[in-house]
Amino acid sequence: MLFMFPRKNNSQTLNESVHTSDMSFHQRSKIATEVNEWLHLACQDRLSDLGMHAETYKEDFDLDRLPTGWGPYPSLDANDVRAKFISDVGIAFAWRFGAIVFVEVPKETRHREVDLLRESLGLPLRDPRVTAEKFFIFIDSARSAQVEYNRLVLPSINQERLGAVAQTLAQSVAMEYYEAVVTQAKVQVLAMLDRIRRQGRIAIPAMRLNSQIADASMAQAEVVGVLHLLDKPDTLWNDAEMESIYLDLRNAFDLEERFKSIEYKIETIKESLRIVLEARNSALAQRLEIIIIVLVGVEVMFSIFGRFHLFGW
């Protein structure tokens, strides 16, 4: 059976979305103040890390259909992400490409929030998450900013910094989804090529091959759509320390290298399918040429026999 790239269901129309820039200055300031106050309380006299949990799903999220409580985040584009304060607990972020990031939210509450979100979006509740990842932020005013494996040390934190870290973590789990999909597709294409080599013939309809090439192109476009967020958030232009840390975070998660690897694998898959399609079309053309030659030969034979019949032979 020919492989298939799973297609994400993306019903969101960007033109219908709300840009963060559409929020009034008062709204942005109010939400930013609330987040900063929560961060101050959460980190006050704290000796442990701020825990972050990210997970991604097969479906895209229609941000305009999120349940009550979800809204734009001051330092991030509302076309891409919405956020929610979870009372007395923490903050959640939902990205349109199917990723969710929780900050200081316990497991039971995470499950409840995901169920509410998926129910509002009309998505199957039983579908499991595809990937999950944990990350931590430790605030220590006596230390300089640095990345330590799955932990970020910062001398201070605000809503802009939290948003930048959450965005990077969301991209990382989304990349894991595409890495798994592309790897599986590559294995299936190699199996198909091996079957063709052993059988010596291509028994695959051209329509199916064309469909798979289109699916691969769509998957490639989805990855590019996720990774366009690699552009540095505008708010970091005024935060030299976090700008440097943002670059370190991207390197720590290997986002650029993973993106290049996925693109290369997809291009390899598409090229392999094109070669098979061309070989199939070439073989079909050869068969058609043979059929035409045979038909011409038959027509000539009938013509000759007809002439013999006229002469009484």
Cite the ranges covered by each PLM segment:
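Juxtamembrane/interface alpha-helical elements of multi-pass membrane proteins
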Residues: A142-N210
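Membrane-associated alpha-helical segments
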Residues: L193-F311
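Short Lys/Arg-enriched alpha/beta "domain-start" segment
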Residues: L2-P155
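Short secondary-structure boundary segments
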Residues: K58-D77, Q159-A180, Y246-L247, V298-M301, ...
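Short, intrinsically disordered, mixed-charge
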Residues: D115-L123, T183, V187, H228
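Generic structural signal of hydrophobic/aromatic residues within well-ordered alpha-helices
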Residues: L66, E113, L117, Y178, ...
